[in-house]
A protein has these predicted regions:
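A conserved active-site cap/scaffold subdomain adjacent to cofactor or substrate pockets
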Residues: 1-71
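C-terminal, non-catalytic "cap/extension" segments appended to globular domains
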Residues: 56, 60-195
């Protein structure tokens, strides 16, 4: 929702007030397009909505190989560079901006990255289901977020500590289906880029 056209249009006048020099000649449409620009990047946390999961996939592939014993730690930088080129078309200039950019592995947090991709897919399915009960675009345009937060509280937040994520999603919006996420990305970026 935070990168949606409706949300950008609703908050943009306030954003312009805080940054009058930088955004004085920039329309809400231009700002929306800039916020949603799809372009491969070197750093996961600076990536766009469309390519983010490719960053996650690189990490997942490397974790699988490490845990499966088919990749040694000393070979991670080369594998990272290979996968970044293959998945994102990017050359990795150094290990700091490559395989050392995240703190997860150095703290022993393996298997964590896929949860980011799942969160995006869960979010798309929840948004789809929320739109059946709440006029999301209208609520955002009017700055009335109470119907959205009420839906989230009723269907998701109050159960977050009681059930595992898959059960929270199933209870809120049925069996998990990643097509909601791929459909969301296809619709959004087809419209943005006239595809």
């Amino acid at each position: 929702m935070g990168r949606s056209r409706g949300f950008i249009e609703a908050i943009y006048p306030t954003v312009q007030q805080f940054f009058p020099e930088q955004l004085g000649g920039v329309s809400a449409e231009q700002f929306y397009r800039a916020v949603n620009k799809a372009q491969p990047s070197l750093v996961r946390t600076e990536s766009d909505e469309l390519t983010y999961c490719l960053h996650v996939m690189v990490r997942y592939e490397i974790e699988k190989q490490l845990i499966g014993g088919t990749l040694e730690a000393k070979d991670v930088p080369a594998e990272w560079a290979k996968l970044y080129k293959e998945y994102l078309g990017i050359d990795v200039p150094n290990d700091r901006d490559g395989c050392l950019q995240d703190s997860h592995w150095s703290s022993g947090a393996f298997g964590y990255f896929p949860s980011y991709a799942l969160g995006n897919a869960y979010g798309a399915q929840m948004l789809h289901n929320m739109e059946q009960d709440v006029d999301v675009e209208d609520s955002i345009a009017k700055g009335e977020l109470a119907p959205i937060t009420a839906w989230l509280h009723e269907k998701v937040h109050q159960y977050g500590g009681l059930y595992v994520p898959a059960d929270v999603v199933r209870n809120a919006c049925g069996t998990f289906d990643p097509h909601y996420y791929t459909d969301y990305l296809t619709r959004k970026f087809s419209e943005l880029y006239g595809l």
